[in-house]
């Protein structure tokens, strides 16, 4: 029988950048708490959140145009009252959230009921909810030390960003990945894919395959439109995979967006990368994230409006230029990027956050 007053609500929805850190934490604390998950209808939540977590969803979306600002506030207000009912019904004792639109009404509802909230901010530049609602939270956990400068009115704790458990153990290369001697590239655009990266990369494929690159291309759920069928034993395309940890650990180079989750996965796996920040990210936070790696020589940062077929081909040619070292061929620039990545320290963030959450468990 579950104990009274040991109920944890996780509020996380939308993109993998919000959901995956929350999942990593939930797996660490699930044996101590009765788990409940608050998300948004028709989003990634239903695909990744385990059924045992009692997934609750709201019909809540984020209008993108300024004309809908009033509508946004009305939706937040309406959702706040719905969440108050949920918090009371489930007897929630603590809320953990990772930001995003679902977080705002959840924080307000919890505050009105005097329920403590812990929010985690993965990005270097805080998101809107963290920036304006963080002061209402018991703690704001930050993924990067420098984020503290933007949250002067909040009780911040530097924890790093939690990663899924598989990133902390050695994983073999999946059987479906092309075998061979050529360098292995992982091309991906985050949980939602990246249409522009896909389009430009398709244009470069013929030459890259001829140059003996092995390629795993994660195109995203809504970016599967291929201009032509690509036939090669060295190329595999998938909408999505849950084996990202294994792919990143065993690849030579990652080509990706620069969400906070991806940045921390690259730091953990020590992999060099080409980063193309999402141009419409709020406060340009993806570019700021990418600079963390490019500034130490572990990544090459290129803005989306600058990428082209020529850029991909010339950049990869430069990174994988062979230099003989005592008779043994090496990739001089790639090896240098790998060494630079080793200078970054990865944190066991999930354990830190687990201890903070369980501190509140002891108080009940």
UniProtKB/Swiss-Prot annotation:
Catalytic reactions on record: di-trans,octa-cis-undecaprenyl diphospho-N-acetyl-alpha-D-muramoyl-L-alanyl-D-glutamyl-meso-2,6-diaminopimeloyl-D-alanyl-D-alanine + UDP-N-acetyl-alpha-D-glucosamine = di-trans,octa-cis-undecaprenyl diphospho-[N-acetyl-alpha-D-glucosaminyl-(1->4)]-N-acetyl-alpha-D-muramoyl-L-alanyl-D-glutamyl-meso-2,6-diaminopimeloyl-D-alanyl-D-alanine + UDP + H(+)
Compartments reported by the entry: Cell inner membrane
GO molecular function, one term: UDP-N-acetyl-D-glucosamine:N-acetylmuramoyl-L-alanyl-D-glutamyl-meso-2,6-diaminopimelyl-D-alanyl-D-alanine-diphosphoundecaprenol 4-beta-N-acetylglucosaminlytransferase activity
Associated pathway: Cell wall biogenesis; peptidoglycan biosynthesis
Membrane topology classification: Peripheral membrane protein
Keyword Transmembrane helix: no
Main location: membrane
One Pfam family in the UniProt entry: Glyco_tran_28_C
GO cellular component: plasma membrane
Any GO BP: regulation of cell shape
EC number(s) given by UniProt: 2.4.1.227
Matching InterPro entries: GlcNAc_MurG (IPR006009), Glyco_trans_28_C (IPR007235), GlycoTrans_28_N (IPR004276)
Alphabetical keyword list: Cell cycle, Cell division, Cell inner membrane, Cell membrane, Cell shape, Cell wall biogenesis/degradation, Glycosyltransferase, Membrane, Peptidoglycan synthesis, Transferase
Binding site for UDP-N-acetyl-alpha-D-glucosamine: 15-17, 123, 164, 191, 286
Function: Cell wall formation. Catalyzes the transfer of a GlcNAc subunit on undecaprenyl-pyrophosphoryl-MurNAc-pentapeptide (lipid intermediate I) to form undecaprenyl-pyrophosphoryl-MurNAc-(pentapeptide)GlcNAc (lipid intermediate II).
Similarity comment text for this entry: Belongs to the glycosyltransferase 28 family. MurG subfamily.
Protein name: UDP-N-acetylglucosamine--N-acetylmuramyl-(pentapeptide) pyrophosphoryl-undecaprenol N-acetylglucosamine transferase
Source organism of the structure: Prochlorococcus marinus (strain MIT 9515)
Gene that encodes the chain: murG
């Amino acid at each position: 029988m579950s104990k009274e007053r040991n109920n944890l609500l996780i509020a996380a929805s939308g993109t993998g950048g919000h959901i995956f850190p929350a999942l990593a934490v939930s797996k660490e604390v699930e044996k101590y708490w009765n788990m409940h998950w608050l998300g948004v209808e028709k989003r990634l939540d239903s695909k990744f959140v385990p059924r045992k977590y009692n997934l609750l969803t709201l019909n809540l979306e984020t209008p993108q145009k300024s004309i809908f600002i009033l509508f946004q506030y009305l939706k937040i207000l309406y959702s706040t009252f719905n969440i108050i009912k949920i918090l009371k019904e489930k007897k929630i004792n603590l809320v953990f959230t990772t930001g995003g639109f679902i977080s705002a009404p959840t924080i307000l509802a919890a505050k009105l009921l005097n329920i403590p909230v812990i929010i985690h901010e993965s990005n270097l530049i805080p998101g809107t909810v963290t920036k304006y609602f963080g002061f209402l939270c018991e703690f704001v956990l930050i993924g990067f030390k420098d984020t503290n400068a933007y949250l002067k009115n909040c009780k911040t704790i530097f924890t790093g960003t939690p990663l899924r458990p598989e990133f902390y153990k050695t994983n073999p290369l999946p059987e479906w990945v092309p075998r061979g001697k050529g360098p292995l590239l992982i091309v991906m655009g985050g949980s939602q894919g990246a249409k522009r990266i896909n389009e430009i990369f398709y244009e470069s494929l013929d030459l890259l395959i001829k140059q003996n690159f092995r390629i795993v291309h994660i195109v995203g759920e809504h970016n599967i439109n291929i201009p032509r069928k690509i036939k090669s034993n060295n190329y595999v395309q998938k909408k999505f995979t849950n084996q990202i940890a294994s792919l990143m650990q065993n690849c030579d180079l990652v080509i990706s967006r620069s969400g906070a989750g991806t940045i921390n996965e690259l730091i953990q796996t020590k992999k060099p990368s080409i980063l193309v920040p999402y141009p419409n990210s709020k406060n340009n936070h993806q570019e700021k994230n990418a600079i963390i790696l490019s500034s130490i020589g572990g990544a090459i940062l290129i803005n989306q409006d600058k990428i082209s077929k020529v850029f991909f081909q010339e950049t990869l040619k430069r990174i994988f230029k062979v230099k003989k070292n005592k008779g043994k061929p090496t990739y001089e620039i790639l090896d240098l990027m790998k060494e630079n990545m080793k200078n970054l320290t990865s944190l066991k963030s999930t354990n830190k956050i687990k201890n903070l959450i369980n501190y509140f468990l002891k108080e009940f």
